[in-house]
Amino acid sequence: MSTILICGHRAYAARGLKSVLEKQGHTVLEFSRGEMKREGNTVTGPVVEIDKNPLFKEDVDVVINFILLQNGSVEENENYIMALLQFCERHSVKRLVQISSISSYPNDAPLIKEDTPIDKHVELKGGYGIIKTAADNLLEKKKDAEPFDIVFVRPGYIVASDNPHPFKGIAKFFGSKLAVLIGDKKATLPCIHRDMFHQCLAEIAIQDMPLCVYLLVEKNNSTKYSYFRSQSRAVVIPLPRRVFFLAADIAKALHVFKERHVCMVKGAFKVNRFDNSLTRNKLKALK
């Protein structure tokens, strides 16, 4: 069995993962931001100094990284990634599993597969997408020089009953019975339930000859509208695609919008197809 470190164990997407891994016989360590302290197998401390944290005494086989400095700059997030790579080297890590996102892919990619290149135009992404894509770009540049595997896991929208913000980026509520969809009825929102996500991670952590990228989306290519309908009975009004595209282009022509703002508007309406056949063939949890 392996010693597995979960970085960012308090994250919504990570809740319950420790139990899944421990039931399979692994020793699980946890790390998150906080004062320098260790209680049992849970360590806290400055995130960007994880490599210098003296409370990690043991070697680690696998690191699963959920940490994203959402209120931090791209530079701060890249500094954390560099510190994490140093930690992995110092603690004899064999595999770093980076929890990435499908938002790392270009908005205009019609078909997304495991080998689809991530977006190189980081500056055109929204705040969350900028950070995720910048971290992925940095890790891709570094992975060949590292003595351990770097594996990217790109899940769809993670669904669970305890999601504190189930409609963030999807719909804006006005009262409890009316909402505006951030996009139209065709805008895609591939999803994966968190329990299935965790079962996949348990396989990925120890799998022989892992894929470079795992694309974790469930079979039905769902949309923002279908997701909303599964979560709420409120009246929801989709936005008109053509009107918003035209408005964004006019705003750019008038120098009110920059190209990034136009991409963010059009990204809310993006329609992608997903083919994760390689991932499905590799993971029992998705079969």
Put a short name on every predicted segment.
Residues 4-24:
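N-terminal Rossmann NAD(P)H-binding glycine-rich loop of SDR-like oxidoreductase domains
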Residues 7-8, 160, 182-187, 214-222, ...:
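Glycine-rich Rossmann NAD(P)(H)-binding loop
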Residues 44-83, 87-90, 105:
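NAD(P)H-binding glycine-rich loop region in Rossmannoid oxidoreductase-like domains
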Residues 83-127:
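Conserved Rossmann-fold NAD(P)-dependent oxidoreductase catalytic core, especially the SDR/UDP-sugar
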Residues 110-153, 157-158, 179:
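Catalytic helix-loop patch of NAD(P)-dependent Rossmann-fold dehydrogenases
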Residues 163-169, 181-205, 211-212:
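Substrate-positioning beta->alpha
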Residues 200-260:
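Mid/C-terminal beta-alpha module of Rossmann-like enzyme folds, strongest
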Residues 222, 234-238, 259-287:
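C-terminal amphipathic/interface module of NAD(P)-dependent oxidoreductases
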